[in-house]
């Protein structure tokens, strides 16, 4: 059975673990990541802007130890051509790992009164488009976004204001979304479990 490494506390990331189990895989928090076949980078605070050559003007919840861990994990999994799925911060980590930059503060996309915003996205031909159609509605609770793309990365979904909501690597098995597919689907919004099911099914091959 596919083992999916999730860096972090199992209690904090229980929604991710639930989605992985529902997709027929095993979430791993304390195992050796080298023994896992897939990496799932979850949401969280902002990455240090020093990683992409900027000074801090609007970052929140910086955690240099986590930054270093995720860069090491990405090096491990990409070197072995193992699948990587990123959500929210996970997508930003992937972009920075490949040399990209971030918008440090993006108005209009963060949560309101602890509730996710909902907005539409438009998808390029891809797995996401096959799952959700050319247009769908996703949740949104981020205040940073992709600015310059890292090497080998390309956009798959965009918000109406042009914000990149999903990306993939052209040659490596990497897929990331800026929204939160692990959260229970809200009425009228895309069912994120479909993404976990499809990506982890491909990762098992």
Give the label of every model feature segment.
Residues 1-87, 95-103, 107-127, 131-137, ...:
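N-terminal beta1-alpha1 cap of cysteine-dependent amidohydrolase-like domains
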Residues 90:
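Conserved SAM-binding loop
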Residues 175-179:
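Active-site-proximal beta-strand elements of phosphoester/diester hydrolases
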């Amino acid at each position: 059975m596919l083992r999916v490494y999730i860096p972090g506390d199992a209690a904090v990331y229980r929604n991710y673990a639930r989605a992985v189990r529902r997709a027929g895989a095993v979430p791993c928090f304390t195992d050796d990541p080298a023994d896992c076949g897939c990496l799932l980078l979850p949401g969280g605070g902002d990455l240090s802007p020093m990683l992409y050559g900027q000074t801090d003007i609007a970052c929140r919840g910086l955690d240099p130890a986590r930054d270093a861990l995720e860069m090491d994990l990405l090096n491990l999994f990409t070197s072995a051509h193992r699948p990587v799925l990123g959500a929210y911060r996970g997508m930003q980590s992937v972009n920075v790992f490949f040399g990209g930059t971030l918008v440090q503060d993006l108005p209009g996309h963060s949560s309101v009164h602890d509730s996710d915003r909902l907005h539409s996205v438009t998808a390029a031909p891809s797995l996401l488009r096959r799952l959700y159609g050319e247009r769908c509605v996703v949740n949104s609770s981020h205040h940073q976004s992709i600015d310059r793309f890292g090497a080998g990365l390309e956009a798959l979904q965009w918000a109406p204001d042009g914000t990149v909501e999903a990306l993939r690597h052209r040659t490596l098995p990497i897929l990331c979304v800026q929204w939160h597919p692990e959260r229970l689907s809200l009425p009228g919004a895309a069912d994120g479990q479909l993404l976990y099911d499809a990506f982890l099914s491909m990762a098992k091959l």
